[in-house]
C-alpha cells in the first residue's frame, strides 16, 4: 500500500531500504514536527503515527483527519508487539490476508536461519548489537538489549545477548561509552553494529580506530566486529526483520 504522504522521506529512505518509499512521495515534515497543513492538504483516509509524537500534536491532527496512534515498540515483548502491530495495520487498511502472509514469511525466515546457524555451530552464540554517534570527538554507544527490536529477533534465532541491562521500556535501548564496553568479556562475542555512510558515518571504524580501550577489547582483538548492511531499519517491521536475520547469519557463519 503506497502512502499519499510521509514524514522525512529522505531520512526514511536513508535508514530503511527494506521497504523503500517512492522519493517523489510528498514530505509532510519531520517525524517530531509534522506539518498539519501539509497532512490535511493530502486528504488522507488515515494518518498512522506513534505515541512518540507529542499528545497535543496528535490531537491537532485528529481534529482534521482520522488518526491511528500506536506505541513505537514494547520492551517487554518486542517481537510479539511487532506481530500485533502488523495485524492492527492490516485490519485498519483492509489488507488482512497480506498481513498474515507477511508474518508467515517472517516465521519461515527465522526457521531457516536457525537451521543455518545450527549447521555453522552457532546456536546459542554470544553477540551484541549496537549503533553510535560522534559528538565533539566523543563516541557514544547505544546498545540493543533483549527488549529491543533487533535484540528480540536475535533471541528468536537462539543467540545470547551479552548486553541485557539498562534498556528503556519502549525500545529496549541502553546508552554507554567505549569504557562501558569492557563489560563484554567473552572474546567469542560477535559485536554487530549499524551505521550509515549517508547520515553520521561510521563511529566505530572511524571514531574508535585509534582508541586504545576499543582496540584492547577481547571481541575487537579477536576480529569479531561486524557492521550490518546499510538500510536495515532498527525499529522496523517484518521486512526489516528478515534483512536483519540474513545479516546476522552472514556475520556469524
Which functions belong to the PLM regions below?
Residues 3, 67-68, 161:
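Hydrophobic beta-strand scaffold residues
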Residues 10, 140-173:
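Alpha-helical, coiled-coil/dimerization segments enriched in small aliphatic residues
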Residues 11-14, 54-56, 72-88, 122-152, ...:
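Extracytoplasmic ligand-binding site segments that recognize negatively charged/polar headgroups
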Residues 28-36, 168-178:
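Short helix-initiation/N-cap motifs at beta->coil->alpha
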Residues 43-49, 181, 186-190:
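Proline-aspartate-enriched helix->loop->beta-strand connector
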Residues 66-136, 231, 235, 239-253:
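Extracytoplasmic substrate-binding proteins
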Amino acid at each position: 500500500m503506497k502512502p499519499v504522504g510521509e514524514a522525512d522521506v529522505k531520512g526514511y529512505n536513508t535508514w530503511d531500504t527494506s521497504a523503500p518509499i517512492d522519493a517523489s512521495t510528498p514530505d509532510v515534515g519531520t517525524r517530531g514536527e509534522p506539518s498539519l497543513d501539509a497532512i490535511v492538504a493530502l486528504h488522507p483516509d488515515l494518518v498512522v503515527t506513534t505515541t512518540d509524537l507529542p499528545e497535543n500534536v496528535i490531537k491537532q491532527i485528529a481534529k482534521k483527519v482520522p488518526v491511528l496512534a500506536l506505541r513505537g515498540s514494547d520492551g517487554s515483548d518486542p517481537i510479539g508487539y511487532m506481530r500485533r502491530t502488523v495485524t492492527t495495520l492490516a485490519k485498519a487498511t483492509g489488507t488482512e490476508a497480506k498481513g498474515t502472509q507477511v508474518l508467515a514469511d517472517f516465521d519461515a525466515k527465522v526457521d531457516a536461519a536457525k537451521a543455518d546457524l545450527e549447521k555453522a555451530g552457532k546456536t546459542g552464540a554470544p553477540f551484541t548489537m549496537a549503533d553510535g554517534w560522534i559528538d565533539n570527538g566523543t563516541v557514544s554507544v547505544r546498545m540493543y538489549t533483549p527488549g529491543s527490536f533487533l535484540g528480540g529477533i536475535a533471541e528468536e534465532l537462539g543467540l545470547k545477548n551479552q548486553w541485557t541491562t539498562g534498556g528503556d521500556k519502549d525500545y529496549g535501548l541502553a546508552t554507554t561509552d567505549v569504557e562501558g564496553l569492557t563489560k563484554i568479556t567473552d572474546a567469542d562475542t560477535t559485536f554487530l553494529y549499524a551505521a550509515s555512510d549517508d547520515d553520521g558515518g561510521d563511529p566505530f571504524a572511524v571514531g574508535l580506530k585509534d582508541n586504545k580501550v576499543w582496540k584492547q577489547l577481547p571481541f575487537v582483538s579477536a576480529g569479531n566486529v561486524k557492521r550490518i548492511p546499510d538500510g536495515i531499519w532498527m525499529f522496523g517491521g517484518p521486512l526489516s526483520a528478515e534483512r536483519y536475520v540474513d545479516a546476522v547469519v552472514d556475520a556469524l557463519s
